[in-house]
Amino acid sequence: MWYTTVRNPSIALIKQGYHILAEYNLVKEELKNIYAIPSYACGLHWFGVIFVHSGIYAGSVFRFSILLPDNFPVDISLPTVVFSTAVLHPHICPQNKTLDLAHFLNEWRKDEHHIWHPYCAERHLKFMDQLKSPCWKEATSMDCSQPSQYLGHIDSSRQLDEEEANQVVKLHCGRVPEPQREAAEVSL
């Protein structure tokens, strides 16, 4: 007996799960300095972190989430990339912290695109020449002839990331029993 995904949504869900697993294996092979993994609760929600080693964002670490459409990979709508902290960049909306992927991809084509394509777009955010073709007014309202001022804003957002990381460590230490906390501090 032949099952179609139209009549059997559970088969469609299983196929989607296998497709996401295959995409995860590709992500592990294709990317450097970007680490991503699908959520345990939902394969359509991925968590990631990017380590920037060059360019004006050198030394920065940015956490982000990727939300895939419900009908992934069949849907032509693009995934949504959301950064966990505000990033000053012309292709990242300062209000909702989303990356404008339309600059890199017009529509999702399941035979051509993979989940690592948005990650590659993120990797290319570090270049200063993109400031000449702005998408967001706040990031480009600054005078780019004064790179030190722009870099100062980048440094301040990097400090916000460090402060957030310190708060997470404090929260985690608050949950760890005292003897285990002391043992962890000694091992550092």
Swiss-Prot record:
SUPFAM superfamilies: UBC-like. Belongs to the ubiquitin-conjugating enzyme family. FTS subfamily. Pfam families: UQ_con. InterPro entries: UBQ-conjugat_E2_core, UBQ-conjugating_enzyme/RWD. This is Protein crossbronx-like. It comes from Drosophila simulans. It comes from the Eukaryota. Residues 15-174 form the UBC core domain.
